[in-house]
Amino acid sequence: MTSHRQSSDTFGGILPSTLSSRYLSIVNQLPEEFSSVVSEMMVHLENIFSLAENFFQAIERFSRTPDLLERNKMSIGVGAEGDSWPCHVSHEAPMGSAQTTENSAKEEDKQVPESAALQHPKFKSTPGPQLPTRRRFLSESDELQDPQPVWDAEPQFCQGFLIQGLWELFMDSRQKNQQEHGGEDSSQESKDSGLCDFKPEPQPRHRNSLSDSADPFLIKSPSALLDYYQEDVSRPQPETQESSGRADKFLKPLSWGSEVLESSCNQPSTALWQLERFTVPQALQKVRVLKHQELLLVVAVSSFTRHVFTCSQSGIKVWNLVNQVAEDRDPESHLKCSVQDNKVYLRTCLLSSNSRTLFAGGYNLPGVIVWDLAAPSLYEKCQLPCEGLSCQALANTKENMALAGFTDGTVRIWDLRTQEIVRNLKGPTNSARNLVVKDDNIWTGGLDACLRCWDLRMAKVSLEHLFQSQIMSLAHSPTEDWLLLGLANGQHCLFNSRKRDQVLTVDTKDNTILGLKFSPNGKWWASVGMGNFITVHSMPTGAKLFQVPEVGPVRCFDMTENGRLIITGSRDCASVYHIKY
């Protein structure tokens, strides 16, 4: 690089080396800080309108009462050390007749007529910031903290740069008014100075007033507000998780609220930019371990009942997500097969699309067991007949239809209202290990490595596509026409369910894939298998976002419909992960 020399005192010359290096270091830091600055601005601007509106209302009240400044100036007393303290100032109001004696004038000064209080509402002091774990509203019975001076030099709600500027303009205007009234007779001040011994009556705090210190939008700094929005309602401790595959340390149980198990779109305070950031996750944080103590086959999570269901051969254990313990060994319920026989055991379970019904099927059972989750207590509602068949896959539709895939290749359909068999679809042996229902089509895949599409209107196979390896898992995108397959050779394949001639291999692993599931928005999917990892992929490229190691092969997993929790089953334990965006 060619070097240039020029006197540092020359106007318009090259900066000295010390200033130049400092300038370059600042420029290099700009890209790193740009993202956080933009996010902070978005968070702060979202709350600035209501805050500024309240502020300008206060200024407007001040401008309408020119004598309010003089009365507030008399409300400041000076102590022995020069400090100021708040003191009560009475407001004179027309009483309907002229007062002629000095005693009556003093009595009038000591009274606060109700009409005057309505005409001149007082500014409320803002208590110091607190650290609430969740945003709450104060009741009318909450006690006030010690009152602060009316004119607070640094009010707690002025933390942003824009509001700080408005406050400075207001203080400048106040100082000018004080200078204009500085030549007035001081006898009036000495006359009312004795009133400083009176303390203001505690006023109840209103829920939307600036004195509500529990409101995080009023008491937090911009950086604290950014953290408030970035944290989940569950309030987990932030834990960085890189895509290198390092596992998060097991944390203490989290105290999440109902928002974790409810759709974020249903929350009235959710803004558009908050929804957009729930596109792809950044990490998984383990928050709980459920000790099932038997080899897990299937796990399911219900946002409706806020429970996790872990299925093994002997039965299904029900765990309450509200209980906050790091390692839970005591389930709420244990649902067992009604038939007690060594040759009878469960193989799979499934939650209905509305999370109100639990299905369970297995080997040598007389029927698929149906439990009613909407009832006050769990009970076996009915059994869907399938005697002599071994169930290995379950599915259901919103039209009160239940489906099951059996080892002999049969796909059976029941009407849940009558528990009667609607139709049997006969396929090759071991061809119905996986079931996916989409519109009027049933997609099946199994150990014969063939993907089949059954048309429910004609009750026959409309498509067969052969893959290179056995189909171990199936999942359909909730937003697009892509069907995702997990193969025994470790491949992820995307199959276009509408065009039916487009197959994309998007990722390859060294181990068998045992489970796949799309996110609710269809922007990513998660996969588990024999590789001892939970892997998160982006859609549609299949790029690996990050991995989370488990203690052993992950046979099964499930995800809540709002994309907030993932439940995995590895060996004899189920792990609850909080998805961090």
Swiss-Prot record:
- What tissues contain this protein? Expressed in spermatogonia (at protein level). Expressed predominantly in ovaries, where it is restricted to growing oocytes, with greatest levels in fully grown oocytes. Expressed predominantly in testis, heart, lung, liver and muscle, and at very low levels in the brain, spleen and kidney. Expressed in bone marrow-derived macrophages and osteoclasts.
Q: Where in the cell is it found?
A: Cytoplasm; Nucleus
The UniProt entry, under InterPro entries, shows: Groucho_enhance (IPR009146), WD40/YVTN_repeat-like_dom_sf (IPR015943), WD40_repeat_dom_sf (IPR036322), WD40_rpt (IPR001680)
WD repeat spans: 246-283, 291-329, 341-381, 384-424, 427-464, 466-505, 508-547, 549-580
Identify one Gene Ontology CC term for this UniProt entry.
nucleus
User: What GO biological process, any one, is recorded here?
Assistant: positive regulation of embryonic development
For region Disordered, the annotated ranges are 90-134, 175-216
Alphabetical list of Gene3D superfamilies matching this protein: YVTN repeat-like/Quinoprotein amine dehydrogenase (2.130.10.10)
Instruction: For this UniProt record, give its keywords in alphabetical order, as a comma-separated list.
Output: Cytoplasm, Nucleus, Phosphoprotein, Repeat, Transcription, Transcription regulation, WD repeat
Assembly and partners?
Answer: Homodimers. Component of the subcortical maternal complex (SCMC), at least composed of NLRP5, KHDC3, OOEP, and TLE6. Within the complex, interacts with NLRP5, KHDC3 and OOEP. The SCMC may facilitate translocation of its components between the nuclear and cytoplasmic compartments. As part of the SCMC interacts with the SCMC-associated protein ZBED3. As part of the SCMC interacts with the SCMC-associated protein NLRP4F. As part of the SCMC interacts with the SCMC-associated protein CFL1/Cofilin-1. Interacts with FOXG1/BF-1; the interaction inhibits TLE1 interaction with FOXG1/BF-1.
Q: Which PANTHER family match?
A: TRANSDUCIN-LIKE ENHANCER PROTEIN, TRANSDUCIN-LIKE ENHANCER PROTEIN 6
The text of the family note is: Belongs to the WD repeat Groucho/TLE family.
Q: What is the official name of this protein in its record?
A: Transducin-like enhancer protein 6
Organism for this UniProt entry = Mus musculus
Write the gene name.
Answer: Tle6
